[in-house]
Amino acid sequence: MLTERQLLILQTIIDDFIGSAQPVGSRTLAKKDEITYSSATIRNEMADLEELGFIEKTHSSSGRVPSEKGYRFYVDHLLAPQNLPNDEIVQIKDLFAERIFEAEKIAQQSAQILSELTNYTAIVLGPKLSTNKLKNVQIVPLDRQTAVAIIVTDTGHVQSKTITVPESVDLSDLEKMVNILNEKLSGVPMSELHNKIFKEIVTVLRGYVHNYDSAIKMLDGTFQVPLSEKIYFGGKANMLSQPEFHDIHKVRSLLTMIDNEAEFYDILRHKQVGIQVKIGRENSATAMEDCSLISATYSIGEEQLGTIAILGPTRMQYSRVISLLQLFTRQFTDGLKK
């Protein structure tokens, strides 16, 4: 159990190192307003903290830096919520204020904004479309031969694609088809749509649509949409701006992992509900052993729909990042309920 004095010194060391990226010595601590102890007392307490494994020496300086154990204790016991500036709150809320909530577009923009606000790498795993349910479908004619099919799901995902309208299918047929599809398919999981259309809907359409065969062929192409979740990155190269990653050899494997993207599917897919912080070697990938990954899930009720994560150095602004992720996931969840 750490004493109050040790807790204060440990917190001050970590806060200073997060801000400066420079090892912290007793002289630096003695100049802090919140530290009222003598240099000798500070040195003794730092020696004890080092012996306990919370801080460690560096090869190039007489100062100390936090260890993984130190960061873990800091996150679990010393972290205080950070109030975000009003302009950042407004910027984030504006992103989610559009009347039509397009989850895919929002996920992409969220990754970009988060990377700009943190100067770290932001990763957003969008909702898995196969678990979405159809809300409605629209077919909007552009001219006599082409139209745009718009598929909207219950989570706000909007999928649009240009389709060719056969000459034998007129506007009244299109209107009848859309009405039947919305009446019969609203609430059906996206993964079941194709089977439902060709097992049940075709029979209904046969009685209402004149050029039935051409209409069915057009429908087949309309509902062929990718069902797996998409992953979006913002600030892929931001790690290079961090002092600890100026050595390209040190960061090469991490940049390769970020660029390939696939490994992050598995990492983010299986996240537990809520905020999770993985520090250094707590991460399963060896390329991330000098990084921290903070992730947050967004959901509707009990259904977890996706994950937002920030990847940065272990010397990360934990409090700020957690506050940002909490705001984003709250806005994302509210948007999906629209």
Curated annotation (Swiss-Prot):
Tell me one GO biological process term.
negative regulation of DNA-templated transcription
What's an example of a GO molecular-function annotation for this chain?
A: DNA binding
Quote the Pfam families the UniProt record gives.
HrcA
> Which UniProt key words apply to this protein?
Repressor, Stress response, Transcription, Transcription regulation
Q: Which InterPro entries match?
A: GAF-like_dom_sf, HrcA, HrcA_C, WH-like_DNA-bd_sf, WH_DNA-bd_sf, WHTH_transcript_rep_HrcA_IDD
Sorted alphabetically, which HAMAP family does this protein's record hold?
HrcA (MF_00081)
What family does the Swiss-Prot or TrEMBL record give for this protein?
Answer: Belongs to the HrcA family.
Q: What does this protein do?
A: Negative regulator of class I heat shock genes (grpE-dnaK-dnaJ and groELS operons). Prevents heat-shock induction of these operons.
Q: What name has this protein been given in UniProt?
A: Heat-inducible transcription repressor HrcA
Task: Please tell me the species this chain comes from.
Answer: Bacillus cereus (strain AH820)
Task: Specify the taxonomic lineage.
Answer: Bacteria, Bacillati, Bacillota, Bacilli, Bacillales
Q: Which gene underlies this protein?
A: hrcA
